[in-house]
Amino acid sequence: MAFNYSGDQDRSEPSLFSYVQQHLDRDFSPVRVLKEESEARILLLRHSISGQFFVLRDCAGNPEIYQKLMTVSSPFLPGVYEVAAQDGRLLVLEEYIQGDTLYSILEQSLFSPGKARRIALQLCEALRILHGFGAVHRDVKPENIILRGSEAVLIDFDASRIQKSSGTSDTVVLGTTGYAAPEQYGLSQTDSRADIYSFGVVLNVMLTGDHPSVRLAKGHMGRIVRRCTMTNPDQRYPNVLRLAEAL
């Protein structure tokens, strides 16, 4: 069964992109569509021999983030195995994270401060790795966090970008309303502190079910959330290491 890739594909010239396509067609079979949007199609695949599940992202985007993720290994980030780009299209073969999203879990019940702190520290470690190679996730939210047993795994890097050394604002506005930092709306170039803002909203939602502008978590956690979500990035924690220390 051949894969139905989005976009026009030119197989006339050998390339890494066409090689990856052929590899996927030969060695994997599609199980189901996990997510489909105008610019992205995400499939669950099964390896024909091992039976192991993988995720295939067929989307528009920059391969640089996923290429960098191929070089790291962390229980809090998905493994990335293949990356190929052609004419603005991107194919990414990555680890399938089996578990429930933080969003679906929070629909059932909120977290104790202790459990929220444990998850928050794991997210700090995932962000520390991303920020370490100059990446900004830009879409940290409960839907993009999967709980695999006791591990919180940060997924979906389609909105991510490599921080530029120059420039005053982002060229593309991406992120999720309510979780995106103010600077993601074109006010200035985003850096790692944009993820700290989103992190603060997620932490507050884990504890209260609400955005901090509606109801702020109590006590020490509330003070952390308040600093994370300051409108001025200079007033937030400067990096996730300082944030983890506060937790």
Task: Give the residues covered by each predicted segment.
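ATP-binding glycine-rich loop module of kinase domains
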Residues: 30-67
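Conserved HxN/HPN-centered segment at the entrance to the catalytic loop
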Residues: 73-82
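Conserved short submotifs of the Hanks-type protein kinase catalytic core
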Residues: 87-101, 105
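Activation segment signature within eukaryotic-like protein kinase domains
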Residues: 119-120
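Catalytic-loop of the protein kinase fold
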Residues: 131-147
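Conserved protein kinase catalytic/activation segment
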Residues: 144-156
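Conserved activation segment of eukaryotic-like protein kinases, specifically the C-terminal portion
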Residues: 169-183
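Conserved catalytic-loop aspartate of Hanks-type protein kinases
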Residues: 195
